[in-house]
Amino acid sequence: VEYKNLNFVSKQISSNFNSNIVQINGDFKNKINLNLISSLLDYNFKDYLDDKILLSSKSNFNISLNKKFKIKDYKLESEINFDSLKVNLDNIDLKKYLTNFEKKFIFKKGKINLILNSNNKTKVKVKSKYVLNDKAEPKEIKLKYSKINSEEKYVLNIDLSEYELDLKKINFNKKEDEELFLNLIITQKKNVYELNNFELFNDKNNFTIKKVEFGNGFKIKDFKLIEANYYNNNNFLNDISIKKKYNNIELKSKNFDISSNIEESLKSTDKSNFFEIFKDLNCIIKI
């Protein structure tokens, strides 16, 4: 079978007829291109993926037709395998945080599992190695995406050990080849984003953020917890916890080195401050 210049090969397709329903089950193998990926996931990937890309896929499907031969129900499960998949990130600038970043993300020897059905449910799972540049050693990445009606969920687990991470605002730097891992859960519903969970950690440092809701301009409308325990570039152990409950914000810290923040503020002509990332919290702050 050929569809949109792509060949489909099937080992088995079976059908079952009764008075009201026609049930069709089967499998097929094919090559997936950019247009088909965009159609399946209802998203245009042309700015991120090469339009000449062809990926190997094997799928199982189930289709139910009513007596007028209109689709009543369907389910598609696909497994896509690849040796290398380059994602172009020309419009994303992470260089000031990830010094090795070269505006590309290359998946290595990975697998994508895709589930689509007629109940407005979509699930995508990616398990792969990755590199940010050609000199790096591939590290693990896992990505899960699900969509049920209008609600979307993203789950990311990534090993950042191969790359230098520089967070000047908090005077933190992680060198190349030093372990660091990121776990991230984000949900989106009706154009409202919520950071459910953020963990950036290794054996010496830990950053945790929970239940952050973003408004316009990605300013923070609400949050539950912002917590950090880390060694800064002065080898000083910082610990800080910011908790919000109802209209009360509690800030606790036994040790926190703000010398670099003061120095940067004195040098900078930018009059912005930390609280500008928040949007009208109207809270009482207890320190």
Write out the residue ranges for each language-model feature.
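Membrane-proximal interfacial segments on either side of biological membranes
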Residues: V1-I287
